[in-house]
Amino acid sequence: MLVVDDEPLIRWSLVEMLTASGHTVTEAPDAASARRVVRDDSQRPDVVLLDYRLPDSNDLGLLAMIRREAPDTQVILMTAHGTPELARGALDLGAYRVVSKPFEVHDLTALVSEAYASTH
């Protein structure tokens, strides 16, 4: 599992929560780091929890790259600025789900587990 978020506190909280739920988690603070992880076959995650707005990628380009290069990886897009158009665009590109920040811990861990189960 890969968590991609540029906000250190949010990223740390997500990593802690998902680790406590039994997931092995890698983290990336930006799109460039996420690309390296996804492209490395030894690290390729089954699920990516991806923040929509990153300093080096504020569109759906990273989502498209992940779906193209790792088609079996499920991507959950997180956003604090969601619109129906963004959700539709993300789902059209193959996002597993789009979730709005803030979210309930239980809901997110259940969604991650569901996404992970769909890869096996």
What residues fall within each predicted segment?
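Alpha4 helix (beta4-alpha4-beta5 surface) of REC/receiver domains from two-component response regulators
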Residues: 61, 82-97
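Short amphipathic alpha-helix used as the core "switch/output" element in two-component signaling
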Residues: 60-72
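Acidic, metal-coordinating helix/loop segments flanking the phosphotransfer/catalytic sites
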Residues: 27-47
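C-terminal output helix
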Residues: 85, 103-113
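Acidic catalytic/metal-coordinating carboxylates
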Residues: 30, 58-61
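Two-component/phosphorelay signaling modules centered on CheY-like receiver
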Residues: 8-27, 93
